[in-house]
Amino acid sequence: MPALDSLKTLRSLAVDGKTYHYYSLPEAARTLGDLGKLPMSLKVLLENLLRWEDGSTVTGDDLKALAGWLRERRSDREIQYRPARVLMQDFTGVPAVVDLAAMRAAMAKAGGDPQKINPLSPVDLVIDHSVMVDKFASESAFEQNVEIEMQRNGERYAFLRWGQNAFDNFSVVPPGTGICHQVNLEYLGRTVWTKDEDGRTYAFPDTLVGTDSHTTMINGLGVLGWGVGGIEAEAAMLGQPVSMLIPEVIGFKLTGKLREGITATDLVLTVTQMLRKKGVVGKFVEFYGDGLADLPLADRATIANMAPEYGATCGFFPVDEITLGYLRLSGRPESTVKLVEAYSKEQGLWREKGHEPVFTDTLHLDMGEVEASLAGPKRPQDRVALQNVASAFNEFLGLQLHPSSTEEGRLLSEGGGGTAVGANAAFGEIDYQHDGQTHRLKNGAVVIAAITSCTNTSNPSVMMAAGLLAKKAVEKGLQRKPWVKSSLAPGSKVVTDYFKAAGLTRYLDELGFDLVGYGCTTCIGNSGPLLEPIEKAIQQADLTVASVLSGNRNFEGRVHPLVKTNWLASPPLVVAYALAGSVRINLSEEPLGTGKDGQPVYLKDIWPSQKEIAEAIQKVDTEMFHKEYAEVFAGDEKWQAIQVPQSDTYEWQADSTYIQHPPFFEHIAEAPPAIADVEQARVLAVLGDSVTTDHISPAGNIKADSPAGRYLREHGVEPKDFNSYGSRRGNHEVMMRGTFANIRIKNEMLGGEEGGNTLYVPSGEKLAIYDAAMRYQEDGTPLVIVAGKEYGTGSSRDWAAKGTNLLGVKAVIAESFERIHRSNLVGMGVLPLQFENGQDRKSLKLTGKEVLNIRGLGGELKPHMPLSVEVTREDGSQDSFKVLCRIDTLNEVEYFKAGGILHYVLRSML
C-alpha cells in the first residue's frame, strides 16, 4: 500500500491505544491549497488518490486536478479510483463468478497460472435475488419458499460454494439471511476501513463498488459506494482501477423536520422527483444542512438507496454523531466506532454544524413541506400525492373501454386452481371464483401488496408504522381483500426480531403479511404467481390492475407481467391498500372498509402517531444485531449440505442449463482485430425513450414459446421448472435468447407492437429478435440498435450488454445513455453513439429498414470523438448524420480496442 506520497502526507493516529497510519488530507492541503470547502465525497476521492499515487495510474497532476475542482466546480479530468471492496448479489454475482471461472479456464488453456485470477480486494456476495413468493399468507410460507428456492437453485448455489472455496478474498452470505444492501448497512460496512500491511495498520475511508445499482444505500453510513456493471466489478476485483471523470457534485440542502404522519418514504419520493427534474445523471449528490441533525441514519439510507432512481451516481451523507449512534446500535465494535470518530474528525470528513461545502449547484427542501405520497404508475420519479392516486390511475387508464380479451395463454401463468367467469369488459370488471366464493375484480384492483425491499425494510420507523397500523386495523375488525397477494420480505432477520419484541407479528400475520422470505422478492419481480382464477380473470377482462410495494422501482411489467401499474409506497400504506383493495379509492377521504361495529374506518383512524412509532422503536436493540450476524456466513443445514468439488478450475457440465462455459474468452491468446468502420449494418430494433435494462435483459418469467423457453424445453426442462431469466444468468445460451425479449418492449419497426419481436428486413418476416439476429449472423451482417433518451436506465445489469454483444450488435445509437449501461456496453466491446443535440431517430426519419455505415473508427480512436453514420434508405437514397462517440475516457478506449474490459485484464496477465 505505501504510495509514492509526493506530498509527504503519511501520518499516524493513536486511537484507544492502537496506532493507525493514514494519508492526511490536512497535510495535502499545505501543498494543494485549502480543502475545507471541498465536498465531503470529493475528499474521499482525494484520499483515495493520495493513497494510490504511483506516478502512472495516479499522478501529482491528478491530485492537483481534484483539489482544483473548487475553482470551476467541475472538471474534465479522468482519474483512476480504487475502492476498498466489492459487493455482489447472486443474480449479478453468478455471471461474474462464471466469467472468473472462464478466465481461469482460458488462462490454463494458454499455459498460464489459473491462480492469477483471484480477487485482490475483499468481495462479499449476498444471495438475496432468488427467493420467490410462491407461498404467502400462511405460517409455513417462509419454510415452503426456502425449500422451493433450494430445489430451484441447487446447481447455482453449488457453483457459488465452489467459488467461495476456489477464490481468495471471496465470501458468500447464504440464502435466507437478508438483502445485500441491508446486510452491508447493518454489518459489512465500517465507515473507516483498515488493512494490515508491512507491519503497519492503515486506516482509510470504507469505499466500494457493487454489482447492483442500489449499492448507493451505504452512502447513508458515510461510505462512498455506487453500482457498476458486473463486468467493471470483476475488473475492479482483479486490481483494475475504476476509471471515472471527476464528477460534478450537486448539494442538496435539507432543513426542518417531517410533519406528524409523514414517513421517510414520502421524503425519498419527494427527493427523487426533485433530483430527476434537476437532472443529475453522472453526478454525485451530497446532502447537507441543519436538517441532517434530526434525520435518522435509517432515513438517510432510504434516501441514499434511491440514487439510481433520481439518476445520480451516489447520494452521500457525511459522518456525524448519528452515524456513530447507528454503528453502536447495529453492534459494531466500540473500537471501530472510536476509530470512525477520530479519523473523520482528523481528516475533515466530520459534519460540523453550519458548515456548507462548495457545490456545482444546489437544491433545497424544507422537510416540513413533504406530503404523504406514492410514486406511479410506472416510474419512480412520478410522485403522486396520496389524495391524487385514484385520479392518476384513472388518467393512466384513459377512461377508455377495454375490449374483452380471451388470450388465456398470452402471458405465463402459474399457480393454484379455480376459474374466471362472468366477464363484463365494458365496465372493466369480472367475477371470479375461489374457494367456493365469488368475488368481483375491477380495474384498479390491488392484486399485490408487498412489504419488500431494502429501501424501506431497513428503516424501523416505517416498518413499525406498518405493524402498528396492522394492529389497529385488526382491532377495528378490518381484513385485506381476498384478491390481494400480501407478503412481508424484510432485508434482515433483525426486522422480524423487533416485530416480535414489539408484539406486532401476529397482527401482520392476521392481515396476510406473513413472512415469505429474507430477500428482494417482489421488488425485483420475484412476486410469484397470483392465484390462477385471478390471473385468468385479469386476462379475460383485460383488466388494468395494480401492485403497491415498498420497493424502489415500478417499471411496467417489472413486478408481475399481468400487473400494468405499480405504486411505490411506505410499508404502512402498503398495508392500507391491502385493506382497501383498490387504488381507485381516495384514502385521504374515503373509508378503507367497515369495522366490526358497522362504522366506516378511515386511514386517519388507524394511522399511528410519531409518539407510538418512537415507543415501538425502543424495542430495537443491539443484541438483535449481534444474534443475527454472529454466523452470517454459515448458512442453514441445507446450505452446509451442498457438495462441491475442490478444484482451482471449474468442471463445466455439458448438460447444465444453469451454468455454461461462456464464449467471451475463446480467442484470448490471439491479438484482437484492429478497430475498423462498421460496414453494411442492419437495424435490429428501433426503441423509444427510457428503455430499461429490464427491457433489454428481463429478470423475470421465461415464456414457454419464447426462444429461451424453446431452448430449455429442447434441453429437457419443463415450463414449471424454467425458474427466471435472472436465475439463469450463468448460461449464455438462455441469456442471449432472452435479450430484448421483455413482453413490454416496444419495437417501432413493428409499429410499436409489444413483445420481443422485430422485422427481418431482407425477407420482411416478423421474427423474435434473437431469431432475426441469428439470421443476420449467418449472413455476416453487423447490427445496430436505435433508441431514444435514457437508454439503459434501471438495474446495473451486465447481461443487458453481454446479450447485446452476443446478438452481434456493434453499436447502439441513442439520444442519451444511463451511466452504468453505457459503461457496460464499452466493457463488452459495443459502441455507444449519441445523436447530436436536436437530432433523433424521428427527425432523421429512421425506420429501421436502412443500411448503415459507421465512419471514422479506422483512425486513432479518442474519447468523445465525432463519427459519421451513412444511411442508405429503402428507396436507395443516401444521406448521413453525425454522432458523438460515448467512449468517455482513455482507459475505455484501451478496453474497447481489446474487445472489452475483461479481455484487456486477461491479456495483461498472460
UniProtKB/Swiss-Prot annotation:
Q: Which key words tag this protein in UniProt?
A: 4Fe-4S, Iron, Iron-sulfur, Lyase, Metal-binding, RNA-binding, Tricarboxylic acid cycle
| One cellular-component annotation, GO | cytosol
Which CDD domains does this UniProt record tie to the protein?
AcnA_IRP, AcnA_IRP_Swivel
| Reactions performed catalytically | citrate = D-threo-isocitrate; (2S,3R)-3-hydroxybutane-1,2,3-tricarboxylate = 2-methyl-cis-aconitate + H2O
Pathway per the UniProt entry: Carbohydrate metabolism; tricarboxylic acid cycle; isocitrate from oxaloacetate: step 2/2; Organic acid metabolism; propanoate degradation
Q: Which InterPro entries match?
A: AcnA_IRP_Swivel, Acnase/IPM_dHydase_lsu_aba_1/3, Acoase/IPM_deHydtase_lsu_aba, Aconitase/3IPM_dehydase_swvl, Aconitase/IRP2, Aconitase_4Fe-4S_BS, Aconitase_4Fe-4S_dom, AconitaseA/IPMdHydase_ssu_swvl
The record's EC number reads 4.2.1.3, 4.2.1.99
Q: Which residues form a coiled coil?
A: none
Q: Which GO biological process categories is it annotated with?
A: anaerobic respiration; propionate metabolic process, methylcitrate cycle; response to oxidative stress; tricarboxylic acid cycle
Q: Which residues bind [4Fe-4S] cluster?
A: 454, 520, 523
Quaternary structure annotation from Swiss-Prot or TrEMBL: Monomer.
Known role = Involved in the catabolism of short chain fatty acids (SCFA) via the tricarboxylic acid (TCA)(acetyl degradation route) and probably the 2-methylcitrate cycle I (propionate degradation route). Catalyzes the reversible isomerization of citrate to isocitrate via cis-aconitate. Could catalyze the hydration of 2-methyl-cis-aconitate to yield (2R,3S)-2-methylisocitrate. The apo form of AcnA functions as a RNA-binding regulatory protein.
- Family as reported in the entry's similarity comment: Belongs to the aconitase/IPM isomerase family.
* Protein name (database record): Aconitate hydratase A
Q: Name the source organism.
A: Pseudomonas aeruginosa (strain ATCC 15692 / DSM 22644 / CIP 104116 / JCM 14847 / LMG 12228 / 1C / PRS 101 / PAO1)
Lineage per the UniProt record: Bacteria, Pseudomonadati, Pseudomonadota, Gammaproteobacteria, Pseudomonadales
